[in-house]
Amino acid sequence: MCNAVTLPDHPISPTQFHNSVYNSPAAYWCIATQTRGPSPSLACAEASFPGALLSATANVFTHKQGVLLVVYDVESPKPFHKQYAIEFNCGIALVLMPSQSENTLAKLDINFQSRKTEEMDMALSPPLVKLISGNASAQPLRMLSAVASQDSREMFYDYLENSAVEVKINPCN
């Protein structure tokens, strides 16, 4: 598609190209549901999940309402694998709320760290490790694994240069 856009006879329409952009699903959802709230879209390669988690957390605190955090990416075409390989499709959604309810599974304490932090990773099963290494959008599986096992855990997600996002997870019983 990227090559086709540059060809003189334009074998791809601007609409087809527009629909391939990472924020078009959010835009179409907002139009269809007549939603007027914020709908940030981020593209930060391996740092997309920690960046989205920080952005969603800021929105929860700023607007005092729940946020649907969706991270996804699709398998990248072979020519892009040298630059940024995505081995399979993955999408994960989390609902972040400003206060606890009877449906709350865990309390998250999310902090920005202005320096890289020693990874305090939990033992993950080989299939989870493979998923996480094959698509950066699978990074929340670490957190979801802790929530599912109802364990209190602390983990770090590498963010931009010399920074990380710290997540402390405490289950709600």
Regions picked out by a protein language model, each given a short descriptive name:
Residues A43-G66:
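Active-site-proximal alpha-helical scaffold in enzymes
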Residues Q65-L68, A93:
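Conserved active-site beta-strand-loop modules that form the wall/rim of enzyme catalytic pockets
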Residues C2-Q16, Y22, A27-P38, Y72-N173:
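Conserved "HGTGT" condensation-loop signature of ketosynthase/thiolase-family condensing enzymes
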Residues C44-F49, V71-P77:
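Acidic, glycine-rich active-site loops and adjacent beta-strand->loop/helix elements
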Residues V21-Y22, F49:
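Conserved donor sugar-nucleotide recognition element shared by glycan-biosynthetic enzymes
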